[in-house]
C-alpha cells in the first residue's frame, strides 16, 4: 500500500484495502483437470528446455549453494551428454510468506517447475488442487525410480496423501534439548545433562538463574512470530510429554487436561522468568534466541537439529567455534518417566521437507528427471558433504552422518521415539491457533483456563465441533 | 532578504501555487484586496482567452456546446478503466467476503457461500474490536492531532522564512516523507532498539528500554507523525499563502495577539483546506500498513491496526474470505469518514 502515489491517495485510500485481497482472489479453476494426457509416458522434448527451480533461499544457504554449484552444472552436463539441450535456473528466494506466494502462483498456473516444499503443506495444497500426484503430472515412470527403495515409508509418506506420492522427500529432523556446557559448568551443573522429568528441566534453569543472573536460563518458543517453530519445538514436545496429542482416536484434541498441563508449564517458565518473554514477542525473536545461544547468553534451548547443522555450524548464521565442546544435547523428557505419549519416558517431534513438481509445468519429463537427479545417491551425497544431515535416503545416511555425533544421536535415539504431524489440510490453521494460544498465555493476555477454552472453540471453528474432543 | 520582500514575491507567485486538492481555495488578486471570489469569477467569464481559466466558469460554457452522447464518449474510457480496476475488485472483494474462500485446502477449490458469517465472526472476534480501536486511536493521534497539528505549526512558524534556512527545514521534513517505507522502518528500528539504539544512547544513564515492546502504540504514533507531517505541512503552507497579507497586517496593526489572529483570521480562511487535509490524512492513516514494518502488529496484537489484521487473517492464515469481509468493513468505515467530512465541508460552504 505504501507504494501508491500520494496524488492518488484519495482513491487509493478507499480502495487499497479491498484491492489487495481482490487482486489475489484469482482463479479457482483447476488448471490440471484438462491435462489428462499427462498419464501417458511423455517424450523427451526436441526443442531446448528451460526449467526453473526455487528453494526460498540465497547464498550462503547451503542448499542454494548446492543447487547452483552442483545440481545445475551436473544436470545440464548429463543432459548435454545425451544430446539434449536443457537449462536450469535457480530462482532465489528468502521471503517470509513463501507458502502464500507459492499457493497464489500455482493457483493461476504459474510458479517454478520444481519447488521446495514443507511436509505439512502437502495435505492442504493437495486438497486445494494446487499440486498433483507425481503419477498424474509425469506418468507411471515415476514408480520406476530407484530411490524409492532407499526411502523409509514413514519418510516418503510425509509427502503423500491417500497413498499418492506428491514429491520426493529430502530428509527429516528431530527436536532435542540443546545446552551450553560451558554455562552448565560455571553453574555447577553436569555437562552430560539428561533430565528425566519437567522438574529437572526447571531445576536446572533455576540453578542457572541464581548462579548466572546475566544469562537467560532457557528458551521455549512461544510467539506467533516464530510460526511453526512455536508449535513444533515448543508446544508439541511439551504436550506429548504430558501424554497428550493433537489428534487421537479419530478426533482433534481440544481443551484436555494434558493441554492445561502444557500451558501450566509455559506459565511456570515465563512467570518465574526462566525464559525471556520479550524474545517471543519481537518480530525477529528466533534469530535473537540463536544469537543469545551462540554468544553464551542463553543456556538451554528446545530446538530442531537444524540449530546444530544450519545455525551454529561454521557456515551458519550464528556460528559457535568449537560447538562440539561447548554445546551438549539431551532427549526431551516427559513430565514424569513414563508419562509421555504412548507411555514414553522421552518425546520428540519431527518434520521434513521435500520437493514437488508444478502440475502446470510445460516439461513434466525433464522436471522429473531433474527432481530424481537431485534425489539420487550421488547428488544427495554431495549435499550432505556440504552439510551433514539426515536425508531421506538410507544409503546416503550410512556415510553422510557417520562422523557427526549430533546427527547420529538424532538418527539413533530420537527418530525411534518421534512424532509426526497429522496429515490433514486443517493442520496449519490448528498450528496457528496453537501459536496464538501460547503467546496469549506468556504475554498475560489470557490465563491458562481462558486460553484453553478459547483454543477449544477456535479448534471447533476450524475442524467442526463434531471433530473435537475435550472439555 | 527582508520579510516584506519575500512576501511580495510570494503574492506574485500565488496563482501558480495551486493547492493540490482545493477547487475551493480562492486565490488572492495581485492587488490583495477585499472580496476575492466573486471578482475572480466575473473576470473568468468576461475575459475569454486567459491562459489560466477558472474551472467552474468554463464548465458551464462547455456543457452548452457538447451534446450528451459526445460527452459520454469522452468519459467512457476513464469510466471503463475505473470500472475494471476499481469497481470490479471492490465488488469482487465484497463477493469473496460472503464465501469461505481460502488460499489452500478444499475451500480453495470449492469455496462455499456462507452469507454474513464472516461479518458476524469479525464482530465477535475480540481481536477485531481491539484492532478497530487501535486503528482509531492511531488515526486520531498520529494523523489528525499529530501530523496536522505539527504540520500547521511548522507551516505557520516558517511562513515568513525564506532562503537557505527555509530550504533546509523543508528538505529535512520532506525527506522523512519521501524515503521508502522499508528503509525508514529499518532506521526507526535501529533508533528504538533496546540495546545500542540511538534513542537510548541519547537518554542519560544506562537505559535499555525496548521501546517497541514497552510503548508499542506510542512508538508507531510518533513514527507516523514524523513520517507524514511533511504532507500536512505542504498543504498548510499552500493554504497560508492564499491568505491576503493585508488581513494579517490589519490584525497586527490593531494589536491582535497571535492566538487572536489565528482564531479570527487564519483559521476561518483556511478551514476548507483543513477539512480536506483532515480527510486525506485520516483515510490515509486509517488504511496504513507501515506499522507492520516496525512491530509486525505486536507485541501480542498491541499495534495490530486493521490493515495488519487483514494481512494476518488473509495472508498469514490464508483466509481470503474472512479477510475480504474485514476489508469490506474497512471500506464502509472509510466511506463514513469521507461522508462526515463532506457534510462538514458542505455546511461550511452553505454558511459562507
Go through the PLM ranges and name each one.
Chain B
Residues 67-352:
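A structural signal for multi-pass alpha-helical bundles of membrane permease subunits
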Residues 1-76, 163-167, 342-352:
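Transmembrane alpha-helical segments of polytopic membrane transport and secretion proteins
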Amino acid at each position: 500500500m505504501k507504494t501508491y502515489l500520494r496524488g492518488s491517495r484519495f482513491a487509493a485510500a478507499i480502495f487499497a484495502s479491498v484491492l489487495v485481497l481482490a487482486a489475489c482472489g484469482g482463479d479457482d479453476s483447476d488448471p490440471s483437470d484438462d491435462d489428462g494426457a499427462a498419464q501417458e509416458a511423455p517424450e523427451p522434448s526436441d526443442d531446448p528446455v528451460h526449467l526453473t527451480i526455487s528453494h526460498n533461499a540465497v547464498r550462503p544457504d547451503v542448499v542454494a549453494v548446492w543447487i547452483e554449484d552442483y545440481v545445475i552444472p551436473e544436470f545440464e552436463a548429463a543432459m548435454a551428454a545425451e544430446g539434449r539441450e536443457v537449462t536450469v535456473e535457480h530462482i532465489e528466494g528468502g521471503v517470509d510468506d513463501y507458502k502464500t506466494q507459492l499457493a497464489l502462483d500455482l493457483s493461476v498456473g504459474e510458479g517454478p517447475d520444481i519447488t521446495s516444499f514443507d511436509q505439512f503443506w502437502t495435505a492442504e495444497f493437495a486438497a486445494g488442487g494446487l499440486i498433483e500426484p507425481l503419477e498424474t503430472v509425469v506418468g507411471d515412470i515415476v514408480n520406476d525410480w530407484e530411490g524409492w527403495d532407499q526411502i523409509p515409508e514413514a519418510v516418503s509418506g510425509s509427502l503423500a496423501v491417500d497413498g499418492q506420492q506428491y514429491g520426493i522427500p529430502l530428509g527429516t529432523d528431530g527436536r532435542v534439548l540443546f545446552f551450553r556446557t560451558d554455562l552448565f559448568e560455571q553453574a555447577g551443573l553436569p555437562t552430560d545433562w539428561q533430565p528425566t522429568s519437567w522438574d529437572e528441566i526447571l531445576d536446572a534453569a533455576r540453578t542457572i538463574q541464581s548462579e548466572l543472573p546475566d544469562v537467560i536460563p532457557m528458551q521455549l518458543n512461544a510467539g506467533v512470530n516464530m510460526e511453526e517453530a512455536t508449535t513444533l519445538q515448543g508446544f508439541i514436545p511439551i504436550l506429548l510429554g504430558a501424554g497428550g496429542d493433537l489428534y487421537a482416536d479419530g478426533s482433534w484434541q481440544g481443551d484436555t487436561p494434558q493441554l492445561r498441563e502444557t500451558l501450566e508449564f509455559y506459565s511456570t517458565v515465563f512467570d518465574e522468568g526462566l525464559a525471556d518473554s520479550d524474545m517471543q514477542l519481537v518480530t525477529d525473536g528466533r534469530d535473537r534466541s540463536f544469537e543469545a545461544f551462540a554468544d553464551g547468553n542463553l543456556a538451554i534451548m528446545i530446538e530442531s537439529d537444524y540449530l546444530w547443522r544450519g545455525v551454529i555450524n561454521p557456515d551458519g548464521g550464528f556460528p559457535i567455534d568449537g560447538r562440539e565442546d561447548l554445546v551438549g544435547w539431551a532427549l526431551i523428557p516427559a513430565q514424569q518417566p513414563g508419562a509421555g505419549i504412548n507411555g514414553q519416558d522421552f518425546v520428540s517431534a519431527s518434520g521434513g521437507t521435500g520437493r514437488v513438481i508444478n502440475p502446470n509445468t510445460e516439461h513434466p519429463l525433464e522436471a522429473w528427471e531433474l527432481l530424481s537427479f537431485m534425489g539420487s545417491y550421488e547428488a544427495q551425497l554431495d549435499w550432505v558433504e556440504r552439510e551433514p544431515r539426515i536425508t531421506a535416503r538410507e544409503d546416503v545416511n550410512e556415510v553422510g552422518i557417520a562422523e557427526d555425533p549430533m546427527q547420529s544421536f538424532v538418527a539413533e535415539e530420537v527418530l525411534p521415539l518421534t512424532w509426526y504431524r497429522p496429515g490433514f489440510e486443517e493442520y496449519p490453521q490448528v498450528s496457528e491457533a496453537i501459536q496464538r494460544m501460547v503467546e496469549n498465555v506468556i504475554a498475560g493476555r489470557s490465563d491458562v483456563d481462558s486460553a484453553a477454552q478459547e483454543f477449544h472453540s477456535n479448534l471447533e471453528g476450524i475442524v467442526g465441533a463434531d471433530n473435537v474432543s475435550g472439555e | 532578504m527582508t520579510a516584506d520582500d519575500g512576501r511580495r514575491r510570494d503574492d506574485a507567485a500565488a496563482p501558480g501555487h495551486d493547492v493540490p486538492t482545493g477547487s475551493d481555495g480562492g486565490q488572492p488578486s495581485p492587488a490583495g484586496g477585499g472580496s476575492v471570489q466573486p471578482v475572480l469569477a466575473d473576470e473568468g467569464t468576461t475575459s475569454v482567452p486567459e491562459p489560466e481559466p477558472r474551472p467552474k466558469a468554463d464548465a458551464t460554457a462547455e456543457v452548452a456546446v457538447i451534446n450528451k452522447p459526445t460527452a459520454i464518449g469522452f468519459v467512457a474510457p476513464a469510466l471503463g478503466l475505473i470500472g475494471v480496476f476499481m469497481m470490479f475488485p471492490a465488488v469482487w472483494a465484497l463477493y469473496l467476503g460472503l464465501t469461505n474462500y481460502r488460499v489452500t485446502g478444499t475451500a480453495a477449490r470449492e469455496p462455499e457461500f456462507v452469507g454474513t458469517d464472516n461479518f458476524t465472526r469479525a464482530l465477535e472476534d475480540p481481536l477485531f474490536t481491539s484492532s478497530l480501536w487501535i486503528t482509531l486511536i492511531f488515526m486520531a493521534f498520529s494523523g489528525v492531532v499529530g501530523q496536522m497539528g505539527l504540520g500547521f505549526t511548522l507551516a505557520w512558524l516558517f511562513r515568513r522564512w525564506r532562503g537557505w534556512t527555509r530550504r533546509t527545514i523543508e528538505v529535512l521534513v520532506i525527506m522523512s516523507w519521501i524515503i521508502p517505507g522499508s528503509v525508514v522502518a529499518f532506521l526507526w528500528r535501529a533508533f528504538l532498539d533496546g540495546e545500542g539504539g540511538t534513542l537510548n544512547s541519547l537518554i542519560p544513564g544506562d537505559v535499555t528500554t525496548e521501546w517497541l515492546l514497552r510503548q508499542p502504540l506510542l512508538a508507531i504514533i510518533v513514527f507516523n507523525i514524523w513520517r507524514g507531517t511533511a504532507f500536512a505541512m505542504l498543504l498548510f503552507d499552500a493554504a497560508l499563502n492564499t491568505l491576503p497579507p493585508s488581513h494579517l497586517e490589519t490584525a497586527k496593526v490593531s494589536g491582535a495577539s497571535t492566538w487572536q489572529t489565528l482564531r479570527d483570521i487564519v483559521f476561518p480562511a483556511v478551514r476548507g483546506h483543513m477539512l480536506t487535509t483532515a480527510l486525506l490524512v485520516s483515510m490515509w492513516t486509517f488504511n496504513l500498513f507501515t506499522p507492520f514494518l516496525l512491530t509486525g502488529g505486536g507485541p501480542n496484537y498491541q499495534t495490530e491496526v486493521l490493515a495488519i489484521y487483514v494481512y494476518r487473517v488473509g495472508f498469514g492464515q490464508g483466509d481470503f474470505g474472512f479477510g475480504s469481509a474485514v476489508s469490506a468493513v474497512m471500506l464502509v468505515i472509510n466511506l463514513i469518514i469521507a461522508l462526515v467530512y463532506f457534510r462538514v465541508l458542505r455546511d461550511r460552504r452553505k454558511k459562507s
